[in-house]
Amino acid sequence: MAQAWAFLLPVLFFGSYVTNLFLPTYASSPLCSGDGGRSFLCAQAPKDKDPSPASTMYKTAFHFQSAKNWMNDPSGPMYFNGIYHEFYQYNLNGPIFGDIVWGHSVSTDLINWIGLGPALVRDTSSDIDGCWTGSVTILPGGKPVIIYTGGDIDQHQVQNIAFPKNRSDPYLREWIKAANNPVLRPDEPGMNSIEFRDPTTGWIGPDGLWRMAVGGELNGYSAALLYKSEDFLNWTKVDHPLYSHNGSNMWECPDFFAVLPGNNGGLDLSAAIPQGAKHALKMSVDSVDKYLIGVYDLKRDAFVPDNVIDDRRLWLRIDYGTFYASKSFFDSNKGRRIIWGWSRETDSPSDDLEKGWAGLHTIPRRIWLADDGKQLLQWPVDEIEFLRTNEINHQGLELNKGDLFEIKEVDTFQADVEIDFELASIDDADPFDPSWLLDPEKHCGEVGASVPGGIGPFGLVILASDNMEEHTEVYFRVYKLQEKYMVLMCSDLRRSSMRPDLEKPAYGGFFEFDLAKERKISLRTLIDRSAVESFGGGGRVCITSRVYPAVLADVGRAHMYAFNNGSATVRVPQLSAWTMRKAQVNVEKGWSAIQNRGSI
């Protein structure tokens, strides 16, 4: 094992990194679309040009992406009549935000996708400014209905409904908008007309009425506004929100679903919820997706969190990296709840114009409640494993302080890696400072993989160049707080690329782990060129990262290592890695390709 820790010398981090989803403003140019200013941005990429090297170098092989142009939020995913549907926010005209419609793709396995034409376009007075995020609810009798936010002619946010034009069409390619759109307007006292969007999937209450929540601002509070309906067409606002909070920005993309402790399956909101079930309320805020666990009080018609936490920095997160606007759905095919999110580009708008595309969706994940009922766990859907090939295995490795073990014989730029780290001793854990919970990213940046600890850092180095000038580190550190153990998981991108014009933070999150009972900490990392998704501790912390290393231009040169830089020895009882084959994603090749997994 090489002793090559010079590559992990401390990195000076110039300037401050600020996670920000506000998109840049473009000046007028000959590329403007001339739509009367309805687009948020007007610059568009030249059409029909040859793909740039960056377009092919950074484009993923098995993540959900549009063939070209801008995409953002997942909207209205569902399983219907044997087919998975993924709708998404999409710009038909270029790789920047604007002119938003609902893209539409279909699949039989959640991995290979056929792109169809747009399901919804902005062609009425209630959505002329954009067909924005929404959900699908399947009504009794197997009738799917879309409810979505539209930007109306006055640039107010309103809620609209659409139905399939022909339910006998297995792909539901055409949708008809309801004649009474918009079905909801932000016209009640205390509502903000430009902060009223992203309706949830509907559910039926004990009184037999439909309910749904819409993200909004009410009297200056962030809220999941609650509405009722008998027929899903005519809605009445309930006099109190499902839940609200006075200490955060407007909640985008709320999601509300039932979970059952000790059950890693999903629960269908349109069916009776079993005794003992809890509910999760997710909101997209502060550029991340956060959530609370609690109960749905049927008498009060309100969500009641198990723990009321005023400081939203302490709210749990779905993902601690570049992940936003997630949407879940109940998969009746396999009795599970699936969630995925939007991972934006972290390069520059000019890069996106050169690439001709921007944005992707994370790998679909199963999501369920941990046995202790305190947090959600996530794991990639099993279907992704159909892309695995060329498996390599190592058992019985031992990593002492400063050790690197190179993982060879897989395509390290397009791989799935599962590794168990077993701690020889837990006596050397450094003390934990609870204030670190307020900003785990800051702590990851302060300690880094080059700073030895009692237990850790240990983990993976991925997408590393020959001289280690470029590399990304995904690793753990173990701390002790009284009789508990806290594990820090980091995905450090600060040396992921030599380019200076990128966002290169050190992402991180903490999870509590009973090391006295279980000495193994698992790590799974999916590497797909510019997208890296990591799952720590069985899905207790998930981190999505976007990276743009030059080493991807010569993919055979990318290296991957298991490492330990802590004082305590770490054993690796099992390390498995696979090369991942390319999926068919939004490329028209006919249905035979996705019906026969052997052809992918």
Swiss-Prot record:
Catalytic residues, per the record, are D73
What InterPro entries does the record tag this protein with? ConA-like_dom_sf, Fructan_Metab_Enzymes, Glyco_hydro_32, Glyco_hydro_32_C, Glyco_hydro_32_N, Glyco_hydro_beta-prop_sf
State the similarity comment.
Belongs to the glycosyl hydrolase 32 family.
Which organism was this protein described from? Leymus chinensis (Chinese lyme grass)
- What reactions does this protein catalyze? Hydrolysis of terminal, non-reducing (2->1)-linked beta-D-fructofuranose residues in fructans
One Pfam family assigned to this protein is Glyco_hydro_32N
The EC designation for this entry is: 3.2.1.153
Give the first-level EC class, as a single word: hydrolase
- The reply on keyword Hydrolase is yes
- Which protein, by its recorded name, is this? Fructan 1-exohydrolase
**Which CDD domains does the UniProt record give?**
GH32_Fruct1-like
Q: Which UniProt keywords apply?
A: Disulfide bond, Glycoprotein, Glycosidase, Hydrolase, Signal
* Leader sequence residues: 1-27
Listed disulfide bonds for this chain? C444-C490
User: Per the UniProt annotation, where are the glycans attached?
Assistant: N166, N234, N246, N565
Activity regulation, short description: Inhibited by sucrose.
User: Which superkingdom?
Assistant: Eukaryota
From the Swiss-Prot or TrEMBL record, what is one GO molecular function term? fructan beta-(2,1)-fructosidase activity
UniProt GO BP: carbohydrate metabolic process
Q: What does this protein do?
A: Hydrolyzes inulin-type beta-(2,1)-fructans. May play a role as a beta-(2,1)-trimmer during graminan biosynthesis.
